[in-house]
Amino acid sequence: MNAVFLAAGYATRLYPLTRDFPKPLLRVGGKPILDWLLDDLAPTGQIARCAVVTNARFAPAFRAWSAAKAFPVPIEVVDDGTATNETRLGAVNDLRLTLEQLEMSGETFVAAGDNLLDFSLALFLDYFRAGNTNCLMRYEEQNEERLKKCGVLELGDGDLVLSMEEKPAAPKSRWCAPPFYLYKDLSAEKIAEALRGGCGADAPGSLAAWIAVREPTRAFPMPGKRRDIGTLESYEAVRALYESRG
């Protein structure tokens, strides 16, 4: 299985912390945010190739980090060539570029590099292996305004995703999909087809939504919480939470 971490954003809401330093490498609980995800995946033994896609501004920091990071396979860093938030490619284009440049295809785990989970990704992988579909995660969101900023799912029997809509004005349910995905057979060509077919380029959930209406996709009920670090306040809150755990 391939693993691709999306880390090409500019995290402008965390300035000045992230003006010249990538958000996924900010430290929480004594190590970079991205380390928590990688250290959780490593014991599964399922990752054959691993990549992080970033931008030209942050590529040197990621290359230094990857050279020192212990992981079962080399961590390949892809530079998408952008240098400003205004010229960013968007997560879906970054994913396409990564698969194309590294000649990756097949089973692929895709995740944002700036989220933390309080449960193991091994459970998500087990859920994926138990079926024969693509998979994403889901949690119930009660706050109407937060719902409108999420990827919202419409579900059928057996956790099957009937539809997914990014940032809907009128959410069809309270099921949100965070940026963690498992694809059975992903390729640069499939993503290019999605983009030609009207798939949004910015949010990674746009690709999941496009695929979900064309290929069977199930939604894993999250057994715990995820921590989305989007602002200085949320970063400080997550840091305090992890420090309180010792």
Regions found by a protein language model. Name each.
Residues N2-F5, R13, R27, K31-A111, ...:
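Conserved N-terminal catalytic core of the sugar/cofactor nucleotidyltransferase
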Residues Y10, G113-N115:
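Active-site metal-binding loops of divalent metal-dependent hydrolases
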Residues L25, V152-L155, A219:
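A structural signal for short hydrophobic beta-strand segments in well-ordered beta-sheet cores
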Residues E145-L162:
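Conserved catalytic core of nucleotide-sugar-dependent glycosyltransferases
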